[in-house]
Amino acid sequence: MRLSYLSLALAIIFVLTIMHASNVEAKASADPEPDAVGSINVKNLMNMIREQITSRLKK
């Protein structure tokens, strides 16, 4: 009999916790890069890396 009271109490606590939880919103902290790509192949990735390295070495 006490086990059913325990499970009922846990269920009530669980429901109250969900009901009184604060709402959370996720916000982007940075703007996306203009050349960002969703899917990229390896050749394009290597070319992008090579361009970044050579541009930094020229400075």
From Swiss-Prot:
Compartments, record wording: Secreted
InterPro entries per record: Pilosulin (IPR049518)
Cellular component aspect of the GO annotation: extracellular region
Primary localization: secreted
Pfam families per the UniProt record, alphabetical: Pilosulin
First and last residue of the signal peptide: 1-21
Keywords recorded for this protein, A-Z: Antimicrobial, Secreted, Signal
Tissue: Expressed by the venom gland.
UniProt organism field: Myrmecia gulosa (Red bulldog ant)
Propeptide residue intervals: 22-38
Family of this protein: Belongs to the formicidae venom precursor-01 superfamily.
Cited function: May have antimicrobial properties, like most ant linear peptides.
Taxonomic lineage: Eukaryota, Metazoa, Ecdysozoa, Arthropoda, Hexapoda
Protein name from the UniProt record: U-myrmeciitoxin(01)-Mg5b
